[in-house]
Swiss-Prot record:
The keyword Cytoplasm does not apply. InterPro entries: Bact_exopeptidase_dim_dom, M20A_pepV-rel, Peptidase_M20, Peptidase_M20A. This is Putative dipeptidase SH1171. Belongs to the peptidase M20A family. Transmembrane segments: none annotated. It comes from Staphylococcus haemolyticus (strain JCSC1435). It holds the Pfam family Peptidase_M20. GO terms for molecular function: acetylornithine deacetylase activity; dipeptidase activity; metallopeptidase activity; zinc ion binding. Keywords: Dipeptidase, Hydrolase, Metal-binding, Metalloprotease, Protease, Zinc. It is an enzyme of class 3 (hydrolase). Zn(2+) 2 binds at residues 84, 115, 173.
């Protein structure tokens, strides 16, 4: 029944999704204002969702242009459907324009198709189809739309300061059949707190280093500028050998008398950095083989001592595992250095329940002072958990099973979704077991089958929760 209903709307679903995907809704603090709190792109995407909702007869409510909601249904209780329309930067290497969606016979290709614009449109259409059917609602529905999920969650933080908290809800921002637990998440910076004088003149001086744009992405590009006193050719040959040895891509050029080294890695979501190749850490590893100026020497040695090839907190002394939630993970998402200020590393740490977070951070903060580094702690989100046997979770899982025939059990992830804003919130799709996960990677796409199947699952789930009651 539900798949047949979705078939009637397939063309509209694709058209509305294409419109949303065409908006480059990447956070841009350089253009932030009261009207565009995290930049014009996210605001434009939020307004777009209001426009299609108003076109379809729904009420909308805006909260300071950083978040808002689409309202449907009636009743005392509220089901929250928590979505986001901001996206991570596109990065390099796409086969097409990431913000000019390509529709093939079986897929849509663009940044945000999986994370989270495709699932947002699927969930929206589930509510729209039920509303068009004029069902007898037993609950209200708030489709809550955020614009800063990929960075600091300023959107939901502001939204829930003044707006009603849903009784229960789901975020269509992960995998099916349901995600009933999420690791704790924090970001912190490891900052070089002083520069050192050189006792002897070094052969090489690291002038600058840049890699990464987001804490929650593995950097796929790194660049270093190095002043080479002599034997430039030797360094270039040594670099080429390093690239060959580690099966990496990169290049070296001379610019204004400085050697510019670039290295390419593989970007993946920071919740499992072991699946990617951190361009920044590999380039620092190479640079560590040079006779550097002292400040740079301390910077690259710190990287190798605590960060390089350590995805699970091993080198930081934070290795920890639980059977329910898995391992601590550490992603080095942003690296920068200049020869006047020194360097810094931006870390995304994810941890399971029962990990002694505060104790670990305090110990590590004290330890790294001996190497000239301070730890600056950012926002901390505690681990989130809902019993998978809760009737709410079971209704979601039943809808998934009815639509797919797959009997998989709910599980936990290292990612973080808006579901953790709610006491009774879980992540629910829209990835399937056989979906190719290119979230935060080049050539991100969603298949039409996945998009429409997710819509039918959301249809049955919302009907079960908000019409049957």
């Amino acid at each position: 029944m539900w798949k047949e209903k979705v078939q009637e709307y397939e063309g509209q679903i694709i058209d509305d999704l294409k419109g949303l995907l065409s908006i480059e809704s990447v956070r841009d603090d350089s253009k932030a204002s009261d009207e565009t709190p995290v930049g014009p792109g996210p605001r434009q995407a939020l307004d777009y969702m209001y426009e299609i909702a108003q076109r379809d007869g729904f009420s909308t409510h805006d909260v300071d242009h950083i978040a808002g909601r689409i309202e449907a249904g009636k009743g005392d209780d509220v089901l929250g459907v928590l979505c986001h329309v901001d996206v991570v930067p596109a990065g390099d290497g796409w086969d097409s324009d990431p913000f000019n969606p390509v529709v093939t016979d079986d897929a849509i290709i663009a940044r945000g198709t999986l994370d989270d614009k495709g699932p947002t449109i699927a969930a929206y259409y589930a509510v729209k189809i039920l509303n068009d059917m004029k069902v007898d609602w037993k609950k209200r529905i708030h489709i809550i739309i955020g614009t800063d999920e990929e960075s600091d969650w300023k959107c939901t933080e502001r939204y829930f300061q003044t707006e009603e908290m849903p009784t229960l809800g789901f975020a269509p921002d992960a995998e099916f059949p349901a995600i009933h637990g999420e690791k704790g998440i924090t970001t912190f910076d490891l900052v070089q707190n002083s520069t050192s004088e050189d006792q002897d003149e070094p052969d090489y001086e690291l002038i600058s280093f840049e890699s990464g744009q987001r804490y929650n992405m593995v950097p796929d590009h790194a660049q270093a500028r190095v002043f080479v006193k002599e034997n430039m050719t030797d360094v270039v040959q040594h670099f080429e050998h390093y690239l060959d040895q580690h099966k990496l891509q990169g290049e070296s050029v001379v610019d204004s008398g400085e050697l510019v080294l670039t290295l390419e890695g593989k970007a993946v979501h920071g919740m499992d950095p072991s699946l990617g190749v951190n361009a920044g850490l590999y380039l620092l590893d190479f640079i560590s083989t040079l006779n550097l100026n002292q400040t740079a020497r301390e910077f690259v040695d710190f990287s190798n001592r605590y960060l390089h090839e350590s995805h699970f907190g091993e080198k930081m002394g934070m290795k920890f595992h639980t059977d329910v939630m898995g391992d601590v993970t550490t992603n080095v998402g942003i690296i920068s250095y200049d020869n006047k200020q020194g360097g810094r590393f931006g870390i995304n740490l994810r941890y399971p329940q029962k990990f002694e977070f505060e104790e670990a951070i305090q110990r590590f903060t004290k330890e790294i002072k001996a190497y000239g580094f301070d730890l600056e702690l950012g926002k901390v989100q505690q681990p989130h958990f809902v019993d998978k046997n809760d009737p709410f979770v079971q209704k979601l899982v039943k809808a998934y099973r009815n639509q797919t025939g797959d009997m998989s059990e709910p599980y936990t992830i290292g990612g973080g979704t808006y579901a953790r804003n709610l006491d009774k919130g879980v992540a629910f799709g829209a990835m399937f077991e056989d979906s190719e996960d290119l979230m935060h990677q080049k050539n991100e796409y969603i298949t039409k089958k996945q998009l429409f199947n997710a819509t039918s699952i959301y249809l049955e789930a919302i009907y079960s929760l908000c019409v049957e009651g």
